[in-house]
C-alpha cells in the first residue's frame, strides 16, 4: 500500500473524454497531460503518451480503446481525475461505468466527420447517468480548410446536444487539434490551456454528498497477500475512514459486515475517503470471493438489498438507437445498476398492453438477484449489449 499522503489543498473534480471512435479522445487526454506538464510543471502534472493511456494489450490490436484509463493532473485552481471513456459501441457497458464517475465531460468531435452515431450515443448516456455538464472539443481543425464547414459542424453538434436537453446554444465549444498540441505547436498548446480554463470555469465544483451515509459501488476487487481484500470504486456519498464498520450489500443472499483497515487514492494513503473520490478500501475478514463488482459498500443499515421495485422509465425511440418494436408484459431485459447488469422481468400497469419505443411508463420490476437500491436510484435497461431505456426507482416493493 502507498506511503505518501494525498494532497487535498485543491478542490477535486472528476472529468472524462467521450465521443465517437477515432475522433481523438485518447490523443486529447495525452495532449492535456503533456501541455499541462509543460506549462504548469508539478509532481502531479506528468506527461502521458497515447500508448500509456491506451495501455491494455487487446486495445492496440484493434486500434480502439476498450478499458477505461484513469489519469490525474492539476490546473492552477483544481485537481482532476480524468477518465478516457471507450468510444466503441461494443464497449458501451464500460462507458456506462466510466461516465457514471464524471462531474463533467469533454465531448470530442472530429471536425472532419462531425457528429457520428456514437457521438449521439455518448450524449444520451451522459444524460442517463447524470453527467450534467458537457464541453465540446472540435478536434482535427487543422485538417479542415473551410471556415463555413467548421461553423456547420458546430451548429450540428449544438443542435444534437439541445435534442438531449443539454444547453446546446450556450455550452462552450473549443476548436483545436490534440495532435498538433501534443507535437508542441504553440498555437494549439494555447488552445489546450484555453480548454482547461473553460473546464475550470464551466464545470462547477461538484456538490459532494459527504454528509450522507457511505455508499461505494464496487467496481473491482483484488487481494493483497498478507493484507487482505481490496475493493475499489468511486465513493457515491458519505465518507470512509480506517476502523469504520461497513456492510457489503447486494447480489448475494446475505449482507456481510466488515471493518475497513486501509483507504488509498492514486496509490497514496488517505485519512478518509470522501464522496467523489476514486478509492481502494482494504477490508478485514473478507475473502476475495465474498465481494464482487455490482455490490455496494455501505454504512450499516443505511441501504438494503431489494428485488422488487416500481420505476419510472423512458424507453428509447428507434432513432435514439432503441428498440424497433414494442415490448409486452413479462419482458425480461437487463437492468444496469451502477456497475453491473441484473436480469429482471417487467410487469406493465393494468390496462397497458404494450410499451412503444419513445414511451414513458411506470413499471414493476422483479430482479433475479437482490441489488442495493432505494428511491431515486437510477438504472439503464439493456438488451443484447445496447441501451433500450433509462429509469429511476420510484418506490421499493420488496
Swiss-Prot record:
EC number(s): the record gives 3.6.5.3
Query: In what residue span(s) does the tr-type G domain sit?
Result: 10-207
According to the lineage, what is the superkingdom? Answer: Bacteria
Which keywords describe this protein according to UniProt? Cytoplasm, Elongation factor, GTP-binding, Hydrolase, Magnesium, Metal-binding, Nucleotide-binding, Protein biosynthesis
Q: Where are the residues of the annotated region G5?
A: 177-179
Q: Where in the cell is it found?
A: Cytoplasm
Q: Name one GO molecular function term.
A: GTP binding
Q: Which intervals of the chain are annotated as region G3?
A: 84-87
> Which InterPro entries does this one have?
EF-Tu_GTP-bd, EF-Tu_GTPase, EFTu-like_2, EFTU_2, G_TR_CS, P-loop_NTPase, Small_GTP-bd, T_Tr_GTP-bd_dom
Q: Where does Mg(2+) bind?
A: 26
Region G1, as annotated, extends over 19-26
In this chain, the stretch annotated as G4 covers 139-142
The record's section on PROSITE patterns has: G_TR_1, G_TR_2
Please name the top-level EC class of this enzyme. Answer: hydrolase
Which SUPFAM superfamilies does this UniProt record tie to the protein? EF-Tu/eEF-1alpha/eIF2-gamma C-terminal domain, P-loop containing nucleoside triphosphate hydrolases, Translation proteins
Binding residues for GTP? 19-26, 84-88, 139-142
One GO cellular component, as annotated: cytosol
Catalysed transformations (reactions)? GTP + H2O = GDP + phosphate + H(+)
Q: Where do the segments described as G2 lie?
A: 63-67
Q: Which HAMAP family match?
A: EF_Tu_B
User: What function is annotated for this protein?
Assistant: GTP hydrolase that promotes the GTP-dependent binding of aminoacyl-tRNA to the A-site of ribosomes during protein biosynthesis.
**What family does this belong to?**
Belongs to the TRAFAC class translation factor GTPase superfamily. Classic translation factor GTPase family. EF-Tu/EF-1A subfamily.
Q: How does it assemble?
A: Monomer.
The entry's protein name is: Elongation factor Tu
* Organism encoding this protein: Streptococcus pyogenes serotype M1
Which gene is the coding source of this polypeptide chain?
tuf
Amino acid at each position: 500500500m502507498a506511503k505518501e499522503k494525498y494532497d487535498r489543498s485543491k478542490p477535486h473534480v472528476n472529468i472524462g473524454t467521450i465521443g465517437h471512435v477515432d475522433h481523438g479522445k485518447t490523443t486529447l487526454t495525452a495532449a492535456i497531460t503533456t501541455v499541462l506538464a509543460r506549462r504548469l510543471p508539478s509532481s502531479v502534472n506528468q506527461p502521458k503518451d497515447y500508448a500509456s493511456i491506451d495501455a491494455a494489450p487487446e486495445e492496440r490490436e484493434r486500434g480502439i480503446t476498450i478499458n477505461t484509463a484513469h489519469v490525474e493532473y492539476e490546473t492552477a485552481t483544481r485537481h482532476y481525475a480524468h477518465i478516457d471513456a471507450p468510444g466503441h459501441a461494443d464497449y458501451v457497458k464500460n462507458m456506462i461505468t466510466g461516465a457514471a464517475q464524471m462531474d463533467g465531460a469533454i465531448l470530442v468531435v472530429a471536425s472532419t466527420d462531425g457528429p457520428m452515431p456514437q457521438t449521439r450515443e455518448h450524449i444520451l448516456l451522459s444524460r442517463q447517468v447524470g453527467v450534467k455538464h458537457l464541453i465540446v472539443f472540435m478536434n482535427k481543425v487543422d485538417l479542415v480548410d473551410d471556415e463555413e464547414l467548421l461553423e456547420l459542424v458546430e451548429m450540428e453538434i449544438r443542435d444534437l446536444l439541445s435534442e438531449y436537453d443539454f444547453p446546446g446554444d450556450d455550452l462552450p465549444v473549443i476548436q483545436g487539434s490534440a495532435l498538433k498540441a501534443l507535437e508542441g505547436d504553440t498555437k494549439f498548446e494555447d488552445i489546450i490551456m484555453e480548454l482547461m480554463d473553460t473546464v475550470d470555469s464551466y464545470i462547477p465544483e461538484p456538490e459532494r454528498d459527504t454528509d450522507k451515509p457511505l455508499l461505494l459501488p464496487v467496481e473491482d476487487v483484488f487481494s493483497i497477500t498478507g493484507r487482505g481484500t481490496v475493493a475499489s470504486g468511486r465513493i457515491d456519498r458519505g465518507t470512509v475512514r480506517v476502523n469504520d464498520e461497513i456492510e457489503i450489500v447486494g447480489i448475494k443472499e446475505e449482507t456481510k459486515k466488515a471493518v475497513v483497515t486501509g483507504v488509498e487514492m492514486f496509490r497514496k494513503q488517505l485519512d478518509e475517503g470522501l464522496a467523489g473520490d476514486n478509492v481502494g478500501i482494504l477490508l478485514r475478514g473478507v475473502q476475495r470471493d465474498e465481494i464482487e463488482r455490482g455490490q455496494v459498500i455501505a454504512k450499516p443499515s443505511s441501504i438494503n438489498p431489494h428485488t422488487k421495485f416500481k420505476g419510472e422509465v423512458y424507453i428509447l425511440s428507434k432513432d435514439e438507437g432503441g428498440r424497433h418494436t414494442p415490448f409486452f408484459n413479462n419482458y425480461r431485459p437487463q437492468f444496469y445498476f451502477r456497475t453491473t447488469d441484473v436480469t429482471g422481468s417487467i410487469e406493465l400497469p393494468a390496462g397497458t398492453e404494450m410499451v412503444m419505443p419513445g414511451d414513458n411508463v411506470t413499471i414493476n420490476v422483479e430482479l433475479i438477484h437482490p441489488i442495493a437500491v432505494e428511491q431515486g436510484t437510477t438504472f439503464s435497461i439493456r438488451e443484447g449489449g445496447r441501451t433500450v431505456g433509462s429509469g429511476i426507482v420510484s418506490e421499493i416493493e420488496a
